[in-house]
């Protein structure tokens, strides 16, 4: 039964994970806006989500969970997928080779943040719906 619940929530979980990783990439771009030669990077969110949904996340050296009771359910550790980072082509290249366009980065950052919040709301609604079904029997 737990595998069915996991399958029902997996898409939103993976979308949230990718949005969080993209937010880190975008914040790195913003932080390095004045670094000479820094190349702005991003990911193609839809293709990365499709890749993760098809291939799954690799088992590996992610965060391990400790079991303090024999009744705890063991969990396998997973690590974030290897993202295909893309270099952004600048609209106006700077003299120092930096390709960060702050307007574009801020817009992408705000857009990604809004979509992250939306995904959280959808996931919360799914969980509330499942809880309602379970409570009603």
From Swiss-Prot:
Pfam families: Flg_bb_rod (PF00460). The keyword Secreted does not apply. It is found in: Bacterial flagellum basal body. GO terms for cellular component: bacterial-type flagellum basal body, rod. Keywords: Bacterial flagellum. InterPro entries: Flag_bb_rod_N, Flagellar_basal_body_rod_CS, FlgB. GO terms for biological process: bacterial-type flagellum-dependent cell motility. It comes from the Bacteria. The basal body constitutes a major portion of the flagellar organelle and consists of a number of rings mounted on a central rod. In Gram-negative bacteria, at least four rings, L, P, S and M are present, whereas Gram-positive bacteria lack the L and P rings. The rod consists of about 26 subunits of FlgG in the distal portion, and FlgB, FlgC and FlgF build up the proximal portion of the rod with about 6 subunits each. Belongs to the flagella basal body rod proteins family. Structural component of flagellum, the bacterial motility apparatus. Part of the rod structure of flagellar basal body. This is Flagellar basal body rod protein FlgB. It comes from Yersinia enterocolitica.
